Amino acid sequence: MELFKHQQEALEQTKDLNRVAYYLDMGLGKTFVGAEKAMSLDKDILIVCQKSKIADWKEHFFKYYIDKMKCDESGAWCYDLTSNTGMDMFLHSRYKIRIGVINYELAWRRQTELLNLHDFTLMLDESSLIQNQGAKQSKFILKLNPDNVILLSGTPTAGKYENLWSQIHLLGWKISEDVYNRQYVNWTKIDMGGFVHKIVDKENPYKNVGRLKSKLREHGAVFMKTEECFDLPEQTFIKQFVPASKEYWKFMKDCIITIDDKELVGDTTLTKRLYARQLCGQYSEYKLQAFRELVESTQDRLIVFYNFTAEYLAMVQIAEELGRPQSIVNGQQKQLLNYEQCDNSITFIQYQAGIE
């Protein structure tokens, strides 16, 4: 496997470290860097990622590592830990390197098995998802006992340094949360209905930022922006596949289904094709979850093309829940204010409207 120059540089910078963070922009190949580092440490590997990425991680390890090894106990094998069978096979595997992949939401529910792991490498894909140290999944991950840690994220804090402490803790920087907040974050108090709340100062939120970044690099963090990597192709295409739902397959078989109190009847070739597309769009939990995970994984400006109004409304709800400003271009309106003013905006464009 041949890595890009910037990926080789990231590995070279951290070659002597066993706790590292690769904060690389989307499209720079964090998966390749993280996997290469993990395999070089020669330990069992536990990967925690978004649910939609489990198959991608398994495919990556089989394609670039396992399929090129001997199929015996001196090699490696990768297991999906979301099933009881996969977890049991992982725990009792006799391969030299056991690789287990599990999603954040399920990991903390597998405490009995995972808290007993020792002498392993923990790799967190989209490590920004543990920034809320009060959440169950974050608390659990901080309880694990890995020998090595690899953090992967394009937006480790979304620019909010007050959310960085959990990742700092995993990198081995021995600073308490209280001291960290006093040294690097400017807090202010506000009165809300007689209750005093502490919030980050809006005008001057952070302090000692240069020292903070220096300490992060000292503890294995590599920051890399797209514009710094001149050897990249001009465009990077990333295909994200999602499975078709059981409702889709039932409709394709029977040509009729009731979903969300609405009956879809494919009594002609045209209506069947139309409803099939809707079942893969606004009615697809898999596709909407993949969209949510994409938005969570980056603070870049996003442009999303859509077909149906119901599909747009479902995605807008997700964007609002995640606090992302939106713009819209369709047959009824053209509002680009947030696109022009907010660098983390999401612009929704209806296909036909986008052509005009």
Language-model features: locations:
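Conserved helicase ATPase core of P-loop NTP-dependent helicases/translocases
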Residues: I303-F305, Y312-I355
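Conserved P-loop NTPase motor "coupling/switch" region that bridges the ATPase
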Residues: D44, K63, G75, M89, ...
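Interdomain linker/hinge connecting the two RecA-like lobes of the SF2 helicase core
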Residues: N18-A21, S127, Q133-G134, L164-I168, ...
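Conserved helix/coil segment N-terminal to the catalytic DExD/H
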Residues: M87-H118, A135, K139
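Conserved pre-motif I regulatory segment
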Residues: M1-Y23
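Walker A/P-loop
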Residues: L17-K37
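Conserved helix-turn-beta segment of the N-terminal RecA-like "Helicase ATP-binding" lobe
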Residues: K53-N84, L171-I175, G323
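Conserved Walker A/P-loop ATP-binding site and its immediately adjacent core
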Residues: V33-E36, D42-K63, A158-N163, Y306-Y312
